[in-house]
């Protein structure tokens, strides 16, 4: 990952990927994961996503990871959630912000996701990936997808991706083809496409984009 790129995006408020409302595809399809109340959801590259507020209000705990500390600070400040900060036991550059909302625990690691270990993240019952895989350049995606599988101990995933002509725009967000989904995940999951719908990019509204929703279940 390129820390300087993402630090600059947040500092300059070029965060069109941060949605002001809960993602309607999360609301529509989260129940397909069949998670019991109290389950713990892992959200990679979580930013300050308001989706986490919705998940807490549905009765789920969360653990997230975000490279940019100011994004995590803004999440807690903008939602009036008190928090504590826990230092990492071995890496002084990693810390965890933790707070409570609607009786649910939200623990957000400030870290490069590739630096985290399974015991840092703890128990994971499902993964919600809305903006992480599509933020990764092609050369990092195999490593990223395997890292999430390892950190979550092969938990089910609800995955949102975009598919468009990558020649028209460099990204991020990057285009992910059906073939690439198979490449990254078929060794570990049964893959089901729940929806593919026309969508747009804030930075390029004239482009033809398909937003895909994937359910990744353990065999």
Curated annotation (Swiss-Prot):
What are the boundaries of the signal sequence? none
Positions bound to S-adenosyl-L-methionine: 10, 45, 66, 130
Superkingdom, natural source: Bacteria
Q: Which top EC class is given? A: transferase
Tell me where it resides.
Cytoplasm
One Gene Ontology molecular-function label? thiopurine S-methyltransferase activity
Annotated EC: 2.1.1.67
Q: Which organism is it from?
A: Psychrobacter cryohalolentis (strain ATCC BAA-1226 / DSM 17306 / VKM B-2378 / K5)
Instruction: Tell me the GO BP annotations in alphabetical order.
Output: methylation; response to metal ion
The family database entries (InterPro entries) matched by this protein are listed as: SAM-dependent_MTases_sf, Thiopur_S-MeTfrase_Se/Te_detox, Thiopurine_S-MeTrfase, TPMT
The protein, known as? Thiopurine S-methyltransferase
Gene Ontology, cellular component aspect: cytoplasm
Q: What is the lineage of its organism?
A: Bacteria, Pseudomonadati, Pseudomonadota, Gammaproteobacteria, Moraxellales
PANTHER family from the UniProt entry: THIOPURINE S-METHYLTRANSFERASE (PTHR10259:SF11)
| Annotated S-S bridges | none
Similarity annotation: Belongs to the class I-like SAM-binding methyltransferase superfamily. TPMT family.
